[in-house]
Amino acid sequence: MKNKFAENIAQLRKEQGLTQKELAEKLGVITRTVSHWETGGQECSLDMLIKIACFFSVTTDELLGIE
C-alpha cells in the first residue's frame, strides 16, 4: 500500500519549488524529518499535520489522500 501522505507532501513541496531543507526551516523541523515523511519512514504528529496542511493551503484530508 502506498503512503499517500508521503507522496502528497513531496509533490506539494516540489510544486512550491522548495527543497527539503527550505520546507524544514519553514516548519521548524530538521531536514531529515522532512525526508523521512517523504519516504514514509516517519509519521508526523496531528499538530504538525495541521501545520503542514495550513502551510500548503490544503485540508488534512487532501494531505492524507482521503477522498
Where is each model-derived feature located?
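A short, Lys/Arg-rich alpha-helix, primarily the initiator
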Residues: M1-E15
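Conserved hydrophobic/aromatic packing and binding residues within compact polymer-binding modules
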Residues: I9, L23-A24, V34-W37, L63
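Alpha-helical residues within the helix-turn-helix
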Residues: K14, E25, C54
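Recognition helix of helix-turn-helix/homeodomain-like DNA-binding domains
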Residues: G28-E43
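DNA major-groove recognition helix of helix-turn-helix/homeodomain DNA-binding modules
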Residues: D47-E62
